[in-house]
Structure formats: structure tokens, C-alpha cells
């Protein structure tokens, strides 16, 4: 019977075990009859409960029952005494009925207990409260009987409730732990293949029960020796009442079973963790080798333009994003496996290392494939970028070559030629870079077959290779056409430079002739003072005419060259129409002036020669008769020369 069931009755204190003992070490059971309203049924229940507490050894020493009838009537006392016969006749050795100071009427108490000893099974004595110490030591009596033993019924009841709760919970917990531990020992191998279920969890917390037990034991041990003056004061919490050894035994059993339970939980937790890790590892491996690998199997193209390559890169980033989630799980699993490996459980080392190795192999292989694909797409993007830049350069060069050339001077043509050469050099550099990128991309595509998972990628690779080679060949052909056009344009522009040079030089020849004519008119006027000087002037004039003739011939040749160049260039000369008439006009004027100059010099030479001859033959005019005919001839030449000089040049 639990105290909680009859708690309202126990609180009435109809009977109690104070913890005191008689001289035979038997326990003292006190029944305080406080009123005539005492329920015999409730008293019987109380006695049954109290007498179930002591151990069998304690019961064998017998009980001394104190029936306090000082505040009750005799018939109630008699009823209680007779009830003891029915409740515990074998355990009761002595019943002390404490009578009131004013004894009951003899008519009432005519019943003689001593005569009924054989029938009752125990001795009954009537005693005054102050005479009770004759049978029981004072320190074993409570204060209401003049003793020194302290008893707090509610305190005892509360401790009793705690004890019963602990006993009940600990006993139940021990049974549960035993079932769990024994079940684990019998089926440890099968447990590895099962997850934790409700049977592994006790109905109460073992830590809480142990804590309650330790607190209860501490209370018992503290109250076991709480007397004064070196004496021992027995309390209702004595080990014979609440079985302190029983609490200790329960605690020892609990600790043992709980330790085993903790080990079982640790093993099961480790097994569960290992199963979860294995399950997650298989999930990661299954996804990477399944959907993840399938995603990579479908991605073999490199695109045919920058936009196409960028679209493939974006698709690859989406694939990488999905993989990164599983790689994060891999990192977490790897840390968990490392922690379990560091725990040093030999039985799981091989399995853990196998899981770790397989997980690492799959993840690293998949990561390598992702990186390879990313590098391939990056190289493809660079290839298409270089190809596009080169195509734009070729388009610009072609546009420049197809445009009409209308330079105004040679410097502009030289600048244009320099720009063409620079563009052609840039195209050559771009084509070289395209070849390098293309070769690198071809090498990567060749290595791509190693990631094919057994898939025949020859078709995909052939398309990629054909595209790359086609782009490079197309760029080479375009570059060659541009080079040919540059050669033609270079020749044309050089001819234009030559044309401009011829036109400039022809104009310069006209200027030179004008300068020669101007010099002839302004500075070539002396005829000489004698024949010798005139001869010298005549010789200089002939050389002067030769220079003018050379200049005129040079100008004519330049103008003829411009005609040929214009025919070759299919253009009209800017100056040949004006320069040639100017050249001819200046040359004609120069020729007329030159001939006039020659005639004058020749007449002057004839005049000086005849005059000098006359003077040489007739040195003394006063004494010699002159040859008048010769003189007349000289005079005639002189007059003719004077007349010639009066004619404008």
C-alpha cells in the first residue's frame, strides 16, 4: 500500500511509529485517541500501513503499543485493543493503555485484560502517563508521555512520501533499464541494423531519480545521528523504518544499470550516427554518380560564339550550384567521420575509412570534372572573344581597303600607308593569338574524352574540333585576302605618291624656267668690252641655255610620267593640264630671248673683233691712212648692234 493512496488518513495521525524502542528493542507503536470520533476502519488502514514498514527482523522483536486513552472513552479504548488482536496479534508483545488521571468507572472497566491475555495473544496493562517510564526509557518516549524523543508527524509523512516515490521510481527504472540492457546484450548484432525506438528511452529520467535518491540518502544519514550531548536520538527515519540500506542498495543498482544503459545508449547513438552517416554518404554518392554525372554528360558543347559560350557558362554555374549543396554535405560528413575516427573505436574503423574513402573519391572526381568543364568553357570563351576581336579588326581593315582613296598630298598617303601596316600587323598578332587559343582548346577537347563515363563523345568532339578549325581557317583566309588587298592598295598609294611627286617636280621645273628666264632678262644684258669678254659671255650663255634645256626636258619627262601614272591609277592629274602649257610657254619665251641674246653676243663679238683688227693694223690713226672700206664695215656692224639693242627683249 502506498502512502499517497491513504494520504488523507495518514495526515490524521491516528497512529504513528515515533522511532522509539522498548527495552527489548521492539518498535513503539503509538495510537493517540484524541476523540470519540475515531474511525476504526481508518485506524485499521493506518495500522496495516505502519506495520508494513519495518523489516521482518524488526517485526520479530515485537511491538510495544501505546494506546493513549487519556482523552477518550473506555469503550473506544477497548475496541482498539480488541482490534489489535485482529490486526497484528503475532507482532504485538505489550499494549500499554494510558489511562486518564481520573480513572474510568469500575463498572465500565470491569473487563480484565490480564485475564484475556491468552485469548488476546499479548499483555495489556493500564498505566498512568507519568508511570509509563517504568516500561519504556524516557528517551524513547515522545514529549506527550514525558519523554525526550522528538517526532514531527508531517515531516515523517513527507519523507515517507519521498522514500516511497523514490522506491517506486527506482524499482520501475531498474526493471526498464534491465530490459533495455539485457535486450541490447542479446541482440547487439541486430541492433546495428535498427534505429532507436521508444524501448530505448526509460519512462523517467535516471539522472533525476539518482538525484532524488542521493538527496534522500543524505537526509537519512543526517537524521540518523542528530542527537545532543553525545547521545543518539532515534528518529522515525531510522534505517529500520525507511531501510537506509535499501536506499543505498537501490542507488548502487541504479548506478550500475545506468552506467550500462549509458554505454548502451552510447553504442546505439554511435551506431545510429554511423547509420545516418552511411545513409547520407550513399545519398551524396548516389546523386553525384546519378543526376550530377548525368548533368555533366549532357554538357559537351563549347558554343559557336561569345553569347553561346556565356550561356553554357551560366548553365554550368547552375550545375555547380547544385553540386555545391552536396559538397557542403560532404564536408560535414567528412568532419563527422573524422570525429568518429578520432574516437578510436576499432570495430568501426574499417567501415568508417571505407565510407570516407568512397565519399572522397566520388566528390573529388566530380569536383575535378566540374573544374575541367569550367576551364574548357573559359578557354572557349577566350577563343571566341579573340575570334570576334580579330573579325572586327578584319572588317575594319577591309572597310578601309574598300573605301575610295582621295588623298590630297603625299604626307596623307604616307600616314594612310602607316595606318594600313599597323592594322595588318595587329591582325597578324590577333591571328597568332587565335591559333594559340585554338590549339589550347583543341588540347582540352582531346582530354575531354577521359571524363566521358564510357560515353562515345567522338561526334561531339568532332563538331567542336571542326568548328575551331573552321574558325581559324576562315580567319586565315580573310587575313590573306586583306593582305592581298593591302599589297594592291600599297602599290596604288605608292603610285599616287609618285604622281604627286612628279606633279610637284614638274611645277618646280616651270618655276625654275621662270627663274632662268627672269635671270636672262634682268642680269644677262652685258655684251662685253672686248671680243675676249664677249666670247666668255657667249660661252656662259650656251651653258645657261643647256641648263634651261635640261630643266625643260626634265619637266617634260615628269609630265609624261604623270600621264602614265594617271592612266594606271585611272584618274585625272590635277596639274598636267595647266603645267604643260606653262612649261611650253615659258620655254618658248626663254628660247626666243635666248636666241636674241645669242645674236646680240655674236654681233658684239663681230664688232669687237673687227674693231680690234682695225686698231691692231692701224695703231696710229693720225699718221696712217685708214682703210675706209674696212672702217665702214665696222661702223655698219656697230650701228646694227645699236639698232638691235633698241629692240625690246
Swiss-Prot record:
Gene3D superfamilies: 1.20.58.60
Spectrin repeat boundaries on the chain: 272-378, 381-494, 500-602
Domain named CRAL-TRIO: residues: 1-153
Classification via InterPro entries: CRAL-TRIO_dom, CRAL-TRIO_dom_sf, Spectrin_SESTD1
Keyword field: Repeat
Molecular function terms from GO: phosphatidylinositol-3,4-bisphosphate binding; phosphatidylinositol-3,5-bisphosphate binding; phosphatidylinositol-3-phosphate binding; phosphatidylinositol-4,5-bisphosphate binding; phosphatidylinositol-4-phosphate binding; phosphatidylinositol-5-phosphate binding
SS bond partners: none
Classification via Pfam families: CRAL_TRIO_2, Spectrin_SESTD1
Domain of life where this protein originates: Eukaryota
General function of this protein: May act as the primary docking protein directing membrane turnover and assembly of the transient receptor potential channels trpc4 and trpc5. Binds phospholipids.
Family per record: Belongs to the SOLO family.
Protein's UniProt name: SEC14 domain and spectrin repeat-containing protein 1-B
Gene giving rise to this polypeptide: sestd1-b
Amino acid at each position: 500500500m502506498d502512502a499517497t493512496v491513504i494520504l488523507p488518513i495518514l495526515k490524521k495521525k491516528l497512529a504513528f511509529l515515533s522511532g522509539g524502542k522498548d527495552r527489548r528493542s521492539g518498535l513503539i507503536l503509538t495510537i493517540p485517541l484524541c476523540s470519540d470520533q475515531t474511525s476504526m476502519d481508518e485506524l485499521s488502514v493506518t495500522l496495516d500501513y505502519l506495520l508494513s514498514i519495518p523489516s521482518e527482523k524488526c517485526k520479530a522483536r515485537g511491538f510495544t503499543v501505546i494506546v493513549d486513552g487519556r482523552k477518550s472513552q473506555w469503550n473506544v479504548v477497548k475496541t482498539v485493543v480488541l482490534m489489535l488482536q485482529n490486526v497484528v496479534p503475532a507482532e504485538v508483545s505489550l499494549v500499554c493503555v494510558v489511562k486518564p488521571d481520573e480513572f474510568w468507572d469500575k463498572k465500565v472497566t470491569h473487563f480484565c485484560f490480564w485475564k484475556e491475555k491468552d485469548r488476546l495473544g499479548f499483555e495489556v496493562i493500564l498505566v498512568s502517563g507519568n508511570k509509563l517510564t517504568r516500561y519504556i526509557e524516557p528517551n524513547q518516549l515522545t514529549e506527550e508521555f514525558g519523554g525526550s524523543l522528538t517526532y514531527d508527524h508531517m515531516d515523517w509523512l513527507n519523507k515517507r512520501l519521498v522514500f516511497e516515490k523514490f522506491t517506486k521510481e527506482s524499482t520501475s527504472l531498474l526493471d526498464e533499464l534491465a530490459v533495455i540492457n539485457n535486450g541490447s546484450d542479446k541482440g547487439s548484432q541486430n541492433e546495428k541494423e535498427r534505429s532507436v525506438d521508444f524501448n530505448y528511452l526509460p519512462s523517467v529520467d535516471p539522472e533525476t531519480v539518482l538525484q532524488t535518491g542521493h538527496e534522500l540518502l543524505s537526509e537519512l544519514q543526517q537524521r540518523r545521528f542528530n542527537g545532543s550531548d553525545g547521545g543518539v536520538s532515534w528518529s522515525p527515519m531510522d534505517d529500520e523504518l525507511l531501510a537506509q540500506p535499501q536506499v543505498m542498495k537501490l542507488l548502487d543498482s541504479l548506478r550500475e544499470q545506468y552506467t550500462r544503459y549509458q554505454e548502451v545508449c552510447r553504442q546505439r547513438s554511435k551506431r545510429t550516427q554511423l547509420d545516418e552517416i552511411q545513409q547520407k554518404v550513399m545519398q551524396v554518392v548516389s546523386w553525384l554518380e546519378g543526376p550530377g554525372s548525368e548533368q555533366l554528360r549532357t554538357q559537351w558543347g563549347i558554343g559557336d560564339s561569345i553569347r553561346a559560350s556565356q550561356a553554357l557558362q551560366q548553365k554550368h554555374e547552375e550545375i555547380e550550384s547544385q553540386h555545391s549543396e552536396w559538397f557542403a554535405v560532404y564536408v560535414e560528413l567528412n568532419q563527422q567521420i573524422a570525429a568518429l575516427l578520432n574516437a578510436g573505436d576499432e570495430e568501426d574503423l574499417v567501415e568508417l575509412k571505407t565510407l570516407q574513402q568512397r565519399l572522397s573519391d566520388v566528390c573529388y572526381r566530380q569536383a575535378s570534372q566540374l573544374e575541367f568543364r569550367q576551364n574548357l568553357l573559359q578557354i572557349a570563351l577566350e577563343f571566341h572573344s579573340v575570334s570576334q576581336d580579330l573579325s572586327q579588326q578584319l572588317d575594319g581593315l577591309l572597310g578601309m581597303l574598300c573605301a575610295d582613296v582621295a588623298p590630297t598630298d603625299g604626307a596623307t598617303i604616307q600616314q594612310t600607308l602607316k595606318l594600313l601596316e599597323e592594322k595588318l600587323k595587329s591582325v597578324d598578332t590577333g591571328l597568332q593569338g587565335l591559333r594559340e587559343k585554338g590549339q589550347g582548346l583543341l588540347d582540352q577537347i582531346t582530354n575531354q574524352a577521359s571524363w566521358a563515363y564510357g560515353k562515345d563523345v567522338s561526334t561531339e568532339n568532332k563538331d567542336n574540333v571542326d568548328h575551331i578549325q573552321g574558325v581559324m581557317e576562315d580567319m586565315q583566309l580573310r587575313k590573306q585576302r586583306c593582305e592581298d588587298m593591302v599589297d594592291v592598295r600599297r602599290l596604288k598609294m605608292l603610285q599616287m605618291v609618285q604622281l604627286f611627286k612628279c606633279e610637284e617636280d614638274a611645277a618646280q621645273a616651270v618655276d625654275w624656267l621662270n627663274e632662268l628666264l627672269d635671270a636672262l632678262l634682268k642680269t644677262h644684258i652685258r655684251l662685253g668690252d672686248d671680243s675676249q669678254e664677249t666670247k666668255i659671255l657667249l660661252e656662259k650663255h650656251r651653258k645657261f641655255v643647256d641648263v634651261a634645256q635640261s630643266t625643260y626636258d626634265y619637266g617634260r619627262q615628269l609630265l609624261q610620267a604623270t600621264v602614265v601614272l594617271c592612266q594606271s591609277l585611272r584618274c585625272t592629274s590635277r596639274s598636267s593640264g595647266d603645267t604643260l602649257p606653262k612649261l611650253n610657254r615659258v620655254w618658248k619665251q626663254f628660247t626666243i630671248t635666248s636666241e636674241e641674246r645669242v645674236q646680240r653676243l655674236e654681233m658684239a663679238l663681230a664688232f669687237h673683233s673687227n674693231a680690234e683688227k682695225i686698231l691692231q693694223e692701224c695703231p696710229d690713226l693720225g699718221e696712217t691712212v685708214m682703210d675706209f672700206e674696212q672702217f665702214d664695215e665696222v661702223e655698219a656692224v656697230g650701228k646694227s648692234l645699236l639698232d638691235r639693242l633698241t629692240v625690246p627683249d
